UniProtKB/Swiss-Prot annotation:
Organism expressing this protein natively: Homo sapiens (Human)
Expressing tissues: Predominantly expressed in neural tissues and lymphoid cells (at protein level). Isoform 2, isoform 3 and isoform 4 are specifically expressed in brain and retina. Isoform 1 and isoform 5 are also detected in liver, lung and skeletal muscle. Also detected in testis and to a lower extent spleen and intestine.
GO function terms (MF aspect): GABA receptor binding; kinase binding; microtubule binding; RNA binding
Family: Belongs to the JAKMIP family.
Mode of membrane association: Peripheral membrane protein
Protein name from the UniProt record: Janus kinase and microtubule-interacting protein 1
Protein's cellular compartments: Cytoplasm, Cytoskeleton; Membrane
Residues modified as Phosphoserine: S382
Principal subcellular localisation of the protein: cytoplasm
Region span, Mediates association with microtubules: 1-365
Region described as Disordered: spans on this chain: 1-22, 452-477
UniProt gene name: JAKMIP1
Record flagged with keyword Zinc: no
Modified residues (Phosphothreonine): T470
GO cellular component assignments: cytoplasm; membrane; microtubule; ribonucleoprotein complex
Length: 626
């Protein structure tokens, strides 16, 4: 009997050893998975540091390029100012020399005329008068010829100087174009490098996120196994209670049957004793087995309590991080409000532009009707020359007005199209996202929805299996879930606001208006240059046909002034171009910062959602035993 009892007592010990080994293996797997998760977190941190380093390098390169460009522009400005100063000094010297020459000529003429007057007063003869007249005519002709030759030489010199200035300007423009092309190529290469680094980082982040998702699935499977083991322990506890009740009933039966033992016959008493001994051995074995199972269940409960404390600490850390993110997102919310105000201002300006376009189209139609009426009157009526000239002048004036209004209408229509395009683009960017799909920087993430649905189903199944918990724990779970949902909704709303702000920045810093403005200024400068060339040709013709004119000095000064005005316009345009380039660069930098911020928010949001789902699932086995 003792050997049989030992063999039967060793079997539950072997079972307990197997269960302990399985629990130790599960614990080792969980620790290894936690270690790998920490390693992945460190890898993600290293990737962020690498992104920060790349960003710092890019900013340094941009600063270096801007410094180099500013130095080149300063050198060009100095060279241009030196050339303009030299031209100004040469023109001033020429003007002083011409003034001195004209003063000398006038003094000589005055002296000669004074001498002739003196001779006439003295009463000279007619021969003297004729001789003096011939001499005066010859001197005037010689002076006129010399002045004409001098003016022709000056015109040739001015033409040569103009050609040199045009060549220098063309050389400067070509140098600027080559430098701009080099800078564009360097900028494009830098942008390609940045995009390549971004793609590599995105690939690494996706790979890490996939690994984290796989590890989350493994953790979920292990937690399900723990839930199954907890259910088995509950069943064992129920079996233990049933066996305890059976033991109590057996003891009561033994007590009840012990009094009539003497009245039974001796054979029957021996049989009863044998049965009692066997029952005692069975009770002892059952008690030992139940004690071992109770010890195992107590150890499992301790492990689950430790796990619960760890998860509570992680939950507190996540709550702290969520509060920090809320504090960081406050300026973005304010920026969103400012962008909404700008949007309202743009809509009001669009309405004003539409009203202006309507008024201008009405005026244009009226002008066309007037022109058609005047043309019909001109066909059917014959007036004198004065009326014809007046009609032609009025027609020219009206035609110029119509052209100006047509230009204004074209500008307003272009601006209206641009604003409508921006409005459509903004409307497309403001479309609501679909349910169960999260729009991220990498695309549409549907696995997060699967993880959420899995967490909800596991939560519901565990709630059906477990015993009813206290109302305080239910309230805590409900509040935590509501907080997580609110955070997720807030993050998605802020992401959409950031997308809207980015679209507005792109529209505000677009290059169409700058290109149109440059084209207009270029056309205006070409028109001014053609006008100046026509003036120069007219002056040459006048000097050749009529001789010396009294207005050539004034026209020369006007040409010098127009040249200076053109140079000032070129300088202003260059300054505006530099300012626009700087604004474009600032807008691009701000855009990249917003993209990086959105990426960080998406990664943090996905990690918080997954950790919150995991925390809910991991809390459930603990709640089963409460």
């Amino acid at each position: 009997m003792s050997k049989k009892g030992r063999s039967k007592g060793e079997k539950p010990e072997m079972e307990t050893d197997a269960v302990q080994m399985a629990n130790e293996e599960l614990r080792a797997k969980l620790t290894s998975i936690q270690i790998e998760f920490q390693q992945e977190k460190s890898k993600v941190g290293k990737l962020r540091e690498r992104l920060q380093e790349a960003k710092l390098e890019r900013e340094q390169e941009q600063r270096r390029h801007t410094a180099y460009i500013s130095e080149l522009k300063a050198k060009l400005h100095e060279e241009k100012t030196k050339e303009l100063q030299a031209l100004r000094e040469g023109l001033i010297r020429q003007h002083e020399q011409e003034a001195a020459r004209t003063a000398k000529i006038k003094e000589g003429e005055l002296q000669r005329l004074q001498a002739t007057l003196n001779v006439l007063r003295d009463g000279a003869a007619d021969k003297v008068k004729t001789a003096l007249l011939t001499e005066a005519r010859e001197e005037a002709r010689r002076a006129f010829d010399g002045e004409r030759l001098r003016l022709q030489q000056e015109i040739l010199e001015l033409k040569a100087a103009r050609k040199q200035a045009e060549e220098a300007l063309s050389n400067c423009m070509q140098a600027d174009k080559t430098k701009a092309a080099d800078l564009r190529a360097a900028y494009q290469a830098h942008q390609d490098e940045v995009h390549r680094i971004k793609r590599e980082c995105e690939r690494d982040i996706r790979r890490l996120m996939d690994e984290i998702k796989g590890k989350d699935r493994v953790i979920l499977a292990l937690e399900k196994e723990l839930g199954v083991q907890a259910g088995q322990t509950q069943k064992l506890l129920l079996q233990k209670e049933a066996l305890d009740e059976q033991l109590v009933q057996v003891k009561e039966a033994e007590r009840h049957h012990s009094s009539p033992k003497r009245e039974l016959p001796p054979g029957i008493g021996d049989m009863v004793e044998l049965m009692g001994v066997q029952d005692q051995h069975m009770d002892e074995r059952d008690v030992r087995r139940f004690q071992l199972k109770i010890a195992e269940l107590n150890s499992v409960i301790r492990k689950l309590e430790d796990r619960n404390t760890l998860l509570a600490d992680e939950r507190n850390e996540l709550l702290k991080r969520s509060r920090e993110t809320e504090v960081q997102l406050k300026p973005l919310v304010e920026k969103n409000k400012r962008m909404n105000k700008k949007n309202e201002d743009l809509l009001q300006s669009i309405q004003r532009m539409e009203e202006k376009i309507k008024n201008l189209t009405r005026e244009n139609v009226e002008m066309k009707e007037k022109l058609s009426a005047q043309a019909s009157l001109k066909r059917h009526t014959s007036l004198n020359d004065l009326s014809l000239t007046r009609d032609e002048q009025e027609i020219e004036f009206l035609r110029l007005q119509v052209l100006e209004q047509q230009h204004v209408i074209d500008d307003l229509s272009l601006e209206r199209e641009r604003l409508l395009r921006s409005k459509r683009h903004r409307g497309k960017s403001l479309k609501p996202p679909k349910k169960h799909v999260v729009e991220t920087f990498f695309g549409f993430d549907e696995e997060s929805v699967d993880s959420e649905t899995l967490s909800e189903t596991s939560y519901n199944t565990d709630r059906t299996d477990r015993t009813p918990a206290t109302p305080e724990e239910d309230l805590d779970d409900a509040t935590a879930r509501e907080e997580a949902d609110l955070r997720f909704c807030q993050l998605t709303r802020e992401y959409q606001a950031l997308q809207r702000a980015y679209a507005l920045l792109q529209e505000q810093v677009g290059g169409t208006l700058d290109a149109e403005r440059e084209a207009r200024t270029r056309e205006q400068l070409q028109a001014d240059l053609l006008r100046c060339q026509a003036k120069i040709e007219d002056l040459e013709k006048l000097l050749v046909e009529k001789g010396q004119d009294s207005k050539w000095v004034e026209e020369k000064q006007l040409l010098i002034r127009t040249n200076q005005d053109l140079l000032e316009k070129i300088y202003r345009l260059e300054m505006e171009e530099n300012q626009l380039k700087n604004e474009m660069q600032d807008a691009k930098d701000q855009n990249e910062l917003l993209e990086f911020r959105v990426l960080e928010l998406e990664v943090r949001d996905s990690i918080c959602c997954k950790l919150s789902n995991g925390a809910d699932i991991l809390f459930e086995p603990k709640l089963k035993f409460m």
